[in-house]
């Protein structure tokens, strides 16, 4: 399967990444963020929800910080499983995520921001066209959610992040940054 074309942007600081996202958004350009790429790239290969721009966080070093009180969005899952600086439960859960190859590429931020899984949506565009669209990919058009027929008010695809439940149980705070400033989600 061939990857569709897109413009890859590689900011080197968080500020550059935020500025770039703001500029793209202000000009009406759609974009995706990419961390480890273990979810996004397979979706792009299947031509699922492809955007013309992708902003990579790989060079934003401040997002790779790992300490006893801070886990950056770009910290690789395998770093958590081998770390004595994080809660043992986080290490245990990180070690259970997917395969070694996925854990070596996958990031904390990417895991938390995983797209929902849906049998109807996660198919080729041709396959989806053959059975009509679903609420997730055609939101706002009155298309039904294929998981629950005759229901078009919400998508019930399941959220698959591995780390979010354990972070919630441990009372973690998630810090977000964007063009409007910083935001902290206390005890997610």
Language model segments and positions:
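C-terminal structural segment of proteins
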Residues: 1-187
